[in-house]
Amino acid sequence: MISKLSRLVVENILKIICEKIIINNILIVNKNNKFSGIIDELYIKAESIIFNKINISNIDIKISDLVLNLAFNNKKSFIKNPYASIKMRLTRDNINKTLSNNKWKSLKTSIESFISMSFQSIEIYNKSIYFISSDGFSNKNIDYILQYDKNSISLVNNINQEKLSIFNDKNISIKNLFFCESHIEIEIGSKIIFN
């Protein structure tokens, strides 16, 4: 009963904080098989996510030491800030939809200034990013990659190695980033903060 209630709370929180989400699986692990408000590990698999106007194809989340204080009798419910390990997949379509959203207009403008071209979309192949110009042509002579360090991701011109920081957050640790044939996979770690 408590496990079902915890699962329902997690599902509802995900549906509240995401503009869109298809939840494939939620697994709650408690070492002593009892629920006392603490979840040792929470695993979430989801797809077709839109979070903060960012489109994500697939996501695997592992949350450790989650404390749920469920309130009854009109007392306030809250969740203490747990640590999350997140693996996400971004397809070409995800990135194009994200960059076409008004929320990310300044990022797109920065990229256009960096690559000296207006673009309508991107392509991912050969472990690189290619920009499709507004007139529909791709400059196959110039490709870009993504590089990461502890808290940031940069777009890098493969010819002259110039960089543009496209993500920087001291609260998020970038663990891994790699290109597959048609998508990008990113692994991050962060404390989850609920406001």
Q: Where do the PLM segments sit?
A:
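Short N-terminal helix-initiation segments at or just after the protein's N-terminus
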Residues: L5-R7, I26-K31, I124, S128
